[in-house]
Amino acid sequence: NFGLDYIKSLEKEEKYNFFPSKKGLTNYGERLSLGFSCLALKAFYMTGEWQDLKTIDKEKWVQHINSFQGEDSKFPKNSYLDPVLINSYSNLGYKENIKYILKRLISISPNFNYDSKNVAINKAINAETKQAVSTLHEVGYKNNKEINKVYSIGHDISYYLNTLDWSKPWSSGAQFASMCVFSETQGLNLKSELQSFIKTISDKETGSYFKEYPKSNREVINGAMKVISGLDWLETEIHHPKKLIDFCLNNKPIL
């Protein structure tokens, strides 16, 4: 299996840590660990390699992923925290910080809705946590510490989901999907709320999920894929599957 062999070749000296590629790595990309370890584990599982590992190796890999679970007052309790990811936001260069400041000023206008740096890093941590939890559950393991608070800014889940920019469903759909994962793996019992919300933004014409039509058809499709991954966790059917299939077939990928 060429793909699996390539992934194995990316493993670092520290076992269960992987490079994202062999060349062209950034300073942070070279040192990030959690996300790439999860992706490699998924690749092992999908190719059947995981089943052939010794139990001790499986448990050590799971322990490695769970070692990132910690407490930091800036993030929901028991989130999965990769220090390198956090530092990449904390130590942004002058130009990047200026961009966030300008975007925040522009967002004063109702016509724009850019994420602040704080919101951006919280979304990143949420995505990392979702990926770790879903990966572990997929292979029959679970997180050590229960995650009973999700990034919902102190309100109920419907309120939080409505604060997201659903003209950008790829990003917002990812947040929705993470809530689905947490609901079903952490016993949060959010299923009915999540089902009710997503039904309200299902689009009968495209089969996708958004409030305001996205700027590109690729965003329509990619957003739908994110939402569908969440619906799968909820064991909920896609609302307009035929429309979505037709839309995808009529919008060929840009090569």
Each model region followed by its residue ranges:
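Low-complexity, Ser/Thr/Pro/Gly-enriched N-terminal "stalk/linker" regions
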Residues: 1-37, 46, 56-62, 73-75
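A generic structured-segment signal
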Residues: 8, 12, 20, 30, ...
